[in-house]
Amino acid sequence: MNRVFKKILPGTMLGLGIMFWGASAQAYKVFVSNEKDNTISVIDSDSFKVIKTVEVGQRPRGIILSKDKRYLYICASDDDHVEVMDTETYKIIDTLPSGPDPELFILHPDGVRLYIANEDDNMVTVVNVNTGQVLVEIPVGVEPEGMAVSPDGKTIVNTSETTNMAHFIDTETLEITDNVLVDSRPRFAEYTDDGKFIWVSSEVGGTVSVISNKTRKVVRKITFHVPGVRNEALQPVGVRVTHDLKTAFIALGPANRVAVVDTQTFEVKKYLLVGQRVWQLAFDAEEKYLYTSNGVSNDISVIDVEDLKVIKSIAVGRYPWGVAVK
C-alpha cells in the first residue's frame, strides 16, 4: 500500500461540490509556494481569491502535483527534504528524502519516481514516492535546478546553473547520455508534448535554447527585447508550451514580462506586463488561463491564453516562487 495513503482517513474524498465557469469548465485550485513566508497559498479558480494559507517547511520553492492530483509535493529547500500535502485536507502528511537544498523536481509519468534537483550537492536524487525510498543519486553538473521528463518517460533532462549545461539522463540506466552546452545559468527545462524538443531558459544569458531530443543539439536560440527595459533585466526562467505546440510562454524575471513566442517561427509575438520578478508559470487543465508567480510584488497574475491579456492580480504570501494547478 502507498505509504501516503496509510496516513489518510478512509472516505476523505472531494466534498466541495462542483462549480462551473459559464456552462462547462470545472472549478479547480491553484497552489502557490511562498518562499519567505514558509507557506502555500491555495486559490479558488471561481473567485480568484486565496481560500487557505498552509504552513509548510522552510523556504518552499518547487511544487508539483501527484499523478492523481491528490497530493502536492513541496521542495522545502532549507529543511533538505520534500513535503507531501493532502490537497483536500491541506495537511502535511509525509516527508520524502532529498539531498541538500532541493529546488525543483519532476515526477515520472509512472507517478512513482520523483527526480529531485539538489542545488548544494550537484546530485539528482530519485525517490519512490510510495515507499519513501531513495532509489539512486545521479551526479550532474554544478548547481542543478531545472528538471524535465520526456512524454514517454525514457529521458530526464536536468539543467546545471554553473556548468551551463542540459544533462540528458536515461531513466533505465540512470546515466547521463548527453551534455548540451547552453547559455549562462540555465534555470528551467520543458519538453514539448510531442517529445521532439526541450526548451531551456538561461537566466543570465538572456536566451531560451530549443534542443532537439533526437540530435541533442541546439536548433534555435530565442532572444528578447522590450523597449525601455535594460537587456540585463531580461532573465528568462519559467517556460510553458501549449498542448497544440503552437505557443510558448516564457517568464522574464525582473523584466516583469511574459514573452509569448510562436513555436513555428520562434519569434516573440507579444510581451505581457505582469507582476514584479515573474518566475514560474502554470496552465489550468484546459489551457484557458496561465498563472504566473511574481516574487517581488507578492502576487499571482492570471493571463487569458486566447486573448493574451492579463485579467487579474491575486495577492498571496511573500516571495511567491512555484505555482501548480489542480
Where do the model's predicted regions map?
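Bacterial N-terminal signal peptides that target proteins for export
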Residues: N2-T12
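Predominantly soluble domains enriched in secretory-pathway, periplasmic, or organellar proteins
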Residues: G15-I18, A23-K326
